[in-house]
């Protein structure tokens, strides 16, 4: 899924979620030297030097603003082969997972992302059986896929083993999806994994990816979408994160144009609110391959009232009404998305 707060090590393969560009190494040094109110062994380069005791995310992807959360306690810090991993207890959003200085999820609002990126595609097709997750090492998407009793096989390819281990330790209610016996975990590069998938294998592919910068750029380009289309059966569906209409319409235009060239079934944009993501929202591309028609805007496959996994809590965010509403776009975004690539 590099950041603007510090020039940290970048992975060369598939990252998890939303890494940022390298920027301002001096901010890291200043933060290290500041008195942030935490114990010495709990200090972090991402604790703000301006607001001691607060975590601050400053990004070129949301210029002119910053997002800060008050830190009650730093629970974990580590460096994997690909990124820096931080977990802290916040005052208002519960535990927070941060990769390379970028918030990936919080206990309070993760449901809005995990539930929507998963159920928008899976509730739009009848009886999905084989599902592939690219990225998503925290296990949240797995948790949501496991609610669907028709699913027989859930494959996940995550590049960073540390993210999986940290999620299981500090976010058990998110990582609970790993307990499902249908799950097959592959540690490795998701792009390479997808290239080796036999044609027509999956009913659905869910891409829990990073932003289209740096090494993740290829996840939003034609070759990657072509690999997804090849891996899907006729009438199969893909769901992938697609940035913010408030900040990234130029990126969304390119994604929509690429998808319309590759996916001959349907191409749609939906969105949800996530307070700790840039601009407080994030979008998804929902596409289908040529074959049985898929009407993403009208769900046909309701989630079981009782999940096969009894340890999973009831849905917090998703329902059929919000499913339909998520495809309603502001006029400025609707004009661009409906005309791009046609």
Curated annotation (Swiss-Prot):
Enzyme Commission number(s) from the entry: 2.5.1.16
GO BP: spermidine biosynthetic process
Region described as Disordered: spans on this chain: 9-42
InterPro entries named in the record: PABS, PABS_CS, SAM-dependent_MTases_sf, Spermi_synthase, Spermi_synthase_euk, Spermidine_synt_N, Spermidine_synt_N_sf
Catalytic residues (UniProt): 208 (proton acceptor)
Chain residues that bind S-adenosyl 3-(methylsulfanyl)propylamine: 83, 114, 138, 158, 189-190, 208
Superkingdom of the source species: Eukaryota
Family: Belongs to the spermidine/spermine synthase family.
Name of the protein: Spermidine synthase
Taxonomic lineage from the root: Eukaryota, Viridiplantae, Streptophyta, Embryophyta, Tracheophyta
